[in-house]
Amino acid sequence: MNFKLSLVYTALFAGISVSALAETRHKANTETIEQINVQDTGIKQNGYQTTGTSVVSKAEVPVFDTPNTVNILSTKLLEDRKPESLIDALYNVSGVSQANTLGGMFDAIQKRGFGRNRDNSIMRNGLQAGPAKNFSATTETVEVLKGPASVLYGIQDPGGVELISLLKNHNKRHVMSLVEP
């Protein structure tokens, strides 16, 4: 009986000593690294509600602190509604209606009663878009800046400006091949 107990005690102490040795070796190999804080200042989307900073005001100002009227259509909203044109996307934005599109050839939007079919108030990624269909499957968000603050983008009607942000291209090339045995 004493032999069995001594055998159990020996195995127990051997196991404890091996784990203690492994723990001391692990502590010797660890390094302390400096903490890095990452802060996101872009548009934060929580479903249909967007918070964060808006691109349309050309400043890193939170949407709630912007003294202008800014409406942002989030990616989630555009995915769920699946609009076919810019006027379909802007259907629920107040003060925005369709202008003369010359039979649906291009986008034309009236903002607060101002605007016509060629008023250059539609921007794609911050640049004036031509008289064409500007809404496509690559549209990520649509922002509407209403009122006289639209002069931030040049000579504009005081009704406002629409900024269409396209999906970001990360310059990754994808190669697909088919190999048959």
From Swiss-Prot:
Domain TBDR plug: 62-167
Family: Belongs to the TonB-dependent receptor family.
Alphabetically ordered keywords of this record: Cell outer membrane, Membrane, Transmembrane, Transmembrane beta strand, Transport
InterPro entries referenced in this protein's UniProt entry, alphabetically: Plug_dom, Plug_dom_sf, TonB-dep_rcpt-like
Chief localization: membrane
Keyword presence, Membrane: yes
Domain TBDR beta-barrel: residue ranges: 180-181
Signal peptide segment: none
Cited Pfam families: Plug
Membrane topology (UniProt): Multi-pass membrane protein
GO CC terms, sorted: cell outer membrane
Record localization: Cell outer membrane
Keyword Transmembrane: yes
Protein name: Uncharacterized protein HI_1466
